[in-house]
Each structure stands twice: as structure tokens, then as C-alpha cells.
Amino acid sequence: MSTVGGIEQLIPDSVSTSFIETVNGSHQFTIQGYSLAKGMSPGKFIQSDIFSVGGYDWAIYFYPDGKNPEDQSSYISLFIALASDSNDIRALFELTLMDQSGKGKHKVHSHFDRALEGGPYTLKYKGSMWGYKRFFKRSALETSDYLKDDCLVINCTVGVVRARLEGPKQYGIVLPLSNMGQGLKDLLDSEVGCDIAFQVGDETYKAHKLILAARSPVFRAQFFGPIGNNNVDRIVIDDIEPSIFKAMLSFIYTDVLPNVHEITGSTSASSFTNMIQHLLAAADLYDLARLKILCEVLLCEKLDVDNVATTLALAEQHQFLQLKAFCLEFVASPANLGAVMKSEGFKHLKQSCPTLLSELLNTVAAADKSSTSGQSNKKRSASSVLGCDTTNVRQLRRRTRKEVRAVS
């Protein structure tokens, strides 16, 4: 999914487009000696030569005495007929009796400008026609500018409807995948053009201020902000481990999480989780939004009874609300609660984040409410599993509310 103007839009795996259009062509039919054609009787016609449009043959039929005997030769009739052995041909038509005075006041009957009313006309078989039995009153024709020197000029336009399907375009040249991230990583590794050095423990990492500023609002303010120092060329980092800072730099340049096992030199799950926890804290420190989300997702995926307490403490410290809610739900599960309380991380949690016990109690109580009956049993269950009596719980809640008011 992508977001445009706040609206999520689907990004499909493949696309195709159907183009419904007309293939147009025209034919001009001239009738010399109109007066000699009169008296042929109704239903008799003069046919144009056959012409082709859109891969089909067509012909113009002119009826000097009209097509219907009921009209008693009061009207001329004009039609366009399908001359091909084809079925169900859909088309638009236009028949025009040309003004020969030069004024341009032609007599036009067009289907093109009425296509939306009922769609194209369908000719079912060879000989099917479209046109008008009462195209023009004959007495008016014979005194008009459409007839000149005993000559009529008829123009016919046909638009055959075609559907054309287009899929992804195939090119002979293969478009390579973007290697921008790798190019920037090579720039970082080679130290070409670096203008800032970070002293992290016993390690020194060089980088480029512009790239750091483009990726991190914190670095941007530090180097180019109103109170920043663009002339600084060395910064000492005291609160991040070297391996964590190196991993963070790699992400800044590549937008890809580095191989954690290679950085830690261990394949154990605990080393992985510990690394991601520290990387999440670093991402929060430098406001790397995408890295924060990636780390939160990984911690949720790797959550277990041994690491949930330390992850919950981290989420509380940095106010990662979604991660915190996920951890609370995990701990409150009857299948996990007992084992979590026996972990070393839980002991640390009670000491470092005592206010979390109140929230955890509420979460356990809510989970307990859905699985047990009897309000008193639920209260005893929720408080006892956390090793608290109800007096301590009330005191903890009051203390929590005071701390919240003090902060706000």
C-alpha cells in the first residue's frame, strides 16, 4: 500500500489496460444526373462503390424515391450497409449531404455525437443497414443548395469499434535493481569524502554530515541547525556501544537492517534480542523513524518469556506505545504469566519501573475477566499472581496518578 494525500492506495503486482476506441474512415459518393434517377420507385436504390473501414467492407445506399412505399416518394432515403460476410459489427456512423454553395451548411445525421445515449449500433449480418428512411424531403432537396447542376455529393464516415488490450511493456534491455544503498555503503566503508568522525568507545567511525543530516533530524540540527556547529569534525559518543552505532550508521546509508548475527558474532536468540533492543534505543535517540519501526516489529516477532520484561521496560522508558501494549498482552496471557514472573528481567522490571505493575495488573485483570467468573475471584487472581495485596495495589495506583500529574 502507498499513501497519497492521506489515502491508502493499492500497489498491484501487475497491470493491464483495455482501450475501447474506433477505427475511422470516410467515403464520398457523388451522384451525377439526379433527375434521371427519379421515378425508380420506392425501395430501389443507387449503390456506391464498396469501400473498407476497420477491416470491413461498406457501401452507401441512396433511395431517390425513398425506401418506404408509404411515403409516396416524398422523401429521399440514405443508408450505410455492411458489405462483408461478418456478424455483430459495432460501429458509429455519420451521413452528410454536402452543401455545394460554399456556405458549409451541410445536412448531417451523425451517430458519433449520440454514442453515449445507447452505444454504438450493431450490424448483425451482411446487408444490415444504418440510416434514415426520411433523410430529407425531396421537394426541399430539389430547391436547395445540396443539389447543383443535377448533382448530389454524399459523404459517409464509419467508426468501427475495436478493443485493444495492453499489458506490461516488454523491453529488450533489462532494468537493473536500484543499487543506491550499496553505493552509499561503499562510500561509508571507503571513507571517501568523510567530514565527521565519531569516537565510540575504542572505535572511530567516519561519515558524511550531509548524508547523516538527510536521514536524521537530530544530526541535521546538530550540524546545520540554528545552534548547530557545521565546523565540528569529531564527536564523542558515550551512551551507545560501538557495535550498535556501527549498525545504525549502516542503516542510515543503506535503509536496510544489517546482519545482526555478523555484528554480534553470535547466533543466539538472546544476543539478537539484546542487539535489537539497543538499536531501537539508538534509533529513538536520533529520530530514525523507519529503523524504530523495524526494531519494534522484530522485537514483537522474537518476544518470549525470557525477554518480554526487558522489552517492556524499554518500551516504557522510550514510550513505544504499540510495543508496550503488545508486551503487556503477552505477559497477561495465562500461558506466559507464571514463567515471566520467574525471569530475571521481571525482577529488574519491578525495581526499575514499579509504575508498570499497575498497568500490568489492569491488563491481567482484563484477561482474567474473560476467562473466570465471579468478581471477587477475579480480583484475588489478578493481585495474587503479581505478588501484591490489594492495599499495595491501591497505593501503587495513587502513586502512579501523582507521577502523571507531576509530569503533566
Curated annotation (Swiss-Prot):
Involved pathway(s): Protein modification; protein ubiquitination
Assigned keywords, A-Z: Cytoplasm, Nucleus
Domain BTB: 194-261
Keyword Disulfide bond: no
GO biological process: cellular response to salt stress; protein ubiquitination; regulation of protein ubiquitination; response to osmotic stress
InterPro entries: BACK_BPM_SPOP, BPM1-6, BPM_C, BTB/POZ_dom, MATH/TRAF_dom, SKP1/BTB/POZ_sf, TRAF-like
Alphabetical list of Gene3D superfamilies matching this protein: 1.25.40.420, Apoptosis, Tumor Necrosis Factor Receptor Associated Protein 2, Chain A (2.60.210.10), Potassium Channel Kv1.1, Chain A (3.30.710.10)
Residues of the MATH domain: 24-158
Superkingdom of this protein's organism: Eukaryota
Tissue specificity statement from the Swiss-Prot or TrEMBL entry: Ubiquitous.
Pfam family, one: BACK_BPM_SPOP
Gene Ontology CC entries for this record: cytosol; nucleus
Main location per the UniProt record: nucleus
MF (Gene Ontology): identical protein binding
Location of this chain's protein in the cell: Nucleus; Cytoplasm
Family, per entry: Belongs to the Tdpoz family.
Complexes and interactors: Homodimer or heterodimer with BPM3 and BPM5. Interacts with CUL3A and CUL3B. Interacts with RAP2-4 and RAP2-13. Binds to MYB56 at the promoter of FLOWERING LOCUS T (FT).
Free-text comment about domains: The BTB/POZ domain mediates the interaction with some component of ubiquitin ligase complexes.
Protein function: May act as a substrate-specific adapter of an E3 ubiquitin-protein ligase complex (CUL3-RBX1-BTB) which mediates the ubiquitination and subsequent proteasomal degradation of target proteins.
Name this polypeptide is given: BTB/POZ and MATH domain-containing protein 3
Record organism: Arabidopsis thaliana
